Amino acid sequence: MSTMTPAEIVSELDKHIIGQGRAKKAVAVALRNRWRRQQVEDPLRQEITPKNILMIGPTGVGKTEIARRLAKLADAPFIKIEATKFTEVGYVGRDVDSIVRDLIEISVKQTRETEMRKVRTKAEDQAEDRILDILLPSARPVGFGASSSAADTVDESSTTRQTFRKRLREGLLDDKEIELDVEQPQVGMDIMGPPGMEDMTEQIRSMFANIGGGKKTRRKLKVKEALKVLTDEEAGKMLNDEEVKTKAVQNVEQNGIVFLDEIDKIASRNEAGGGEVSRQGVQRDLLPLVEGTTINTKYGMVKTDHILFIASGAFHLAKPSDLIPELQGRFPIRVELDSLSVNDFESILVSTDASLVKQYQALLATEDVHLEFADDGIRRLAEIAYSVNEKTENIGARRLYTVIEKLLEEVSFAAGNHSGRTVQIDAAYVDRALNEVAEDEDLSRYVL
């Protein structure tokens, strides 16, 4: 679990996302409250439930990016899903319980990787020993008089082994091919099952996965690849699968985060008809999950009482009040994200850690083409992106991708001809490349 303070979390998010201070603060406090709850004594700890968040804002302003970056900072099981993927129980499609099943799978993988890191050093030593056994078959003296020289043979063998171990660690044997016996990976089998029968389907899938497991096969690999395969195999042997499952379930129950995107698409609109029953059904199915229930998974029963839910939606056609009242009450913290201004676009282009300008400079530098963006060029790019958003469909920061891609189309295509050159991107260059398209509304609708 992350022990970062809210200010530190916001500072990390600021490196990748421009503006949206209220949303950043809300998720930072929610994440910190997970840690605070763990410090509270047990009887009261069980009563403290997370305060779920509803993020409201147009597309492309950073809702999903905040969730994605939060996942990396949280060091906790995290899943992002679209609410539109789910249908009411009884309809064809996925039911909402599969959210928890997917989350526990992520947690098991995460926990397994964490536990494997703890034993990796020991596993690497054992993998080295297995490779050295193949490279240096033990010389056992046989016949009359063998015992008299046995000690000398062992000493010589030990010295040779240490020499080879040193060369192995220095990477001098990486390209040497060896034959070795490795365990066959378990082959997964995709089985389709009727709605509501996910547990049975999962059991059948597990049964087929175990068939043939544990068998060894002889493979020819380079030493470098063999070392990785054997290290993973040895680390896997050291793990206690039951312990991994128990820790994974506990991690989901105490630290799990679910990001529900496009929640506005399952909101019921009074004037609409048709699919309203199914939409309301999905909302009602979500209720117990968000409030706290117990879901049966192949790893055991999982309680959702302390899982944090973050929902987001543009709410262009529907309003948050169109959600059923019970579900509205499960998301007490609401934050509105602002539409992006020209200044925001300018900051997105240059101020973030992995800004678009830095990305394109790095890409073209691989072909010895150097891009230099002047301040007036950056400003003009931001103005054009903002203008196209206003005239056509507002897709937020994603508009910058289409604008800058169109701007650098010719340079990227003929990069080989520009090798060793520096391309200056100023306002005049931007106008030459984009002005005609940006000013023609019909063209910009299709090109930008």
Swiss-Prot record:
Example GO biological process: proteolysis involved in protein catabolic process
Main location: cytoplasm
Signal sequence region: none
One MF term in the entry's GO annotations: peptidase activity
Locations listed in the record: Cytoplasm
GO cellular component, one term: HslUV protease complex
Pfam families (alphabetical): AAA, AAA_2
Transmembrane segments: none
Residues annotated to bind ATP: 18, 60-65, 261, 326, 398
CDD domains: RecA-like_HslU
Entry keywords, A to Z: ATP-binding, Chaperone, Cytoplasm, Nucleotide-binding, Stress response
UniProt record similarity statement: Belongs to the ClpX chaperone family. HslU subfamily.
Subunit structure: A double ring-shaped homohexamer of HslV is capped on each side by a ring-shaped HslU homohexamer. The assembly of the HslU/HslV complex is dependent on binding of ATP.
NCBIfam families reported for this sequence: hslU, PRK05201.1
Function as written in the Swiss-Prot or TrEMBL entry: ATPase subunit of a proteasome-like degradation complex; this subunit has chaperone activity. The binding of ATP and its subsequent hydrolysis by HslU are essential for unfolding of protein substrates subsequently hydrolyzed by HslV. HslU recognizes the N-terminal part of its protein substrates and unfolds these before they are guided to HslV for hydrolysis.
Protein name: ATP-dependent protease ATPase subunit HslU
Upper lineage: Bacteria, Pseudomonadati, Pseudomonadota, Betaproteobacteria, Burkholderiales
